[in-house]
């Protein structure tokens, strides 16, 4: 083998090792972010919802601070119901589309996929309707 071939092979192996250390993004959460963008017509970036109030983002406790935070609490509860049904809501892929008046679930036959898609579509539509108060971003320390 030529030295140049060895260098290319080594570079590929190092790249693969680096990529293997990147944790995979749950597919459903990626789809959920697309649904949010569809519902709000791109008016607010998805990351604005990742650490909002007491329930938007990872975990949730205390009393929701406003309507948007209640949307997140309802979404968390919906995922909890999905888990009780034996579904894995953060990992399930489903079929949806973005119409002029917002996101919709396509004709989904599998119960778990349909349930989770409905959770996400309803939350995305709720986010789009609720006012966003930037004072409620990054306040988890106030949530009990």
UniProtKB/Swiss-Prot annotation:
PANTHER family in the record: PHOSPHOLIPASE A2, PHOSPHOLIPASE A2 FAMILY MEMBER
Any one GO biological process: arachidonate secretion
Main location (coarse class): secreted
PROSITE patterns, per the entry: PA2_ASP, PA2_HIS
Species of origin: Austrelaps superbus (Lowland copperhead snake)
Residues where Ca(2+) binds: 55, 57, 59, 76
Compartments reported by the entry: Secreted
Coiled-coil residue windows: none
A Gene Ontology term for the protein's cellular component: extracellular region
Active site: residue positions: 75, 120
InterPro entries: PLipase_A2, PLipase_A2_Asp_AS, PLipase_A2_dom, PLipase_A2_dom_sf, PLipase_A2_His_AS
Family: Belongs to the phospholipase A2 family. Group I subfamily. D49 sub-subfamily.
Binding note for cofactor: Binds 1 Ca(2+) ion.
Signal peptide (UniProt feature, chain positions): 1-19
Key words, A-Z: Calcium, Disulfide bond, Hemostasis impairing toxin, Hydrolase, Lipid degradation, Lipid metabolism, Metal-binding, Platelet aggregation inhibiting toxin, Secreted, Signal, Toxin
SMART domains assigned to the protein according to its UniProt record, in alphabetical order: PA2c
Physiological role: Snake venom phospholipase A2 (PLA2) that inhibits collagen-induced platelet aggregation. PLA2 catalyzes the calcium-dependent hydrolysis of the 2-acyl groups in 3-sn-phosphoglycerides.
CDD domains: PLA2c
Known tissue expression: Expressed by the venom gland.
Disulphide bridges: 38-98, 54-143, 56-72, 71-126, 78-119, 87-112, 105-117
Catalytic reaction annotation: a 1,2-diacyl-sn-glycero-3-phosphocholine + H2O = a 1-acyl-sn-glycero-3-phosphocholine + a fatty acid + H(+)
Molecular function via GO: calcium ion binding; calcium-dependent phospholipase A2 activity; phospholipid binding; toxin activity
Descriptive protein name: Acidic phospholipase A2 S12-65J
UniProt keyword Hydrolase present: yes
Proregion positions: 20-27
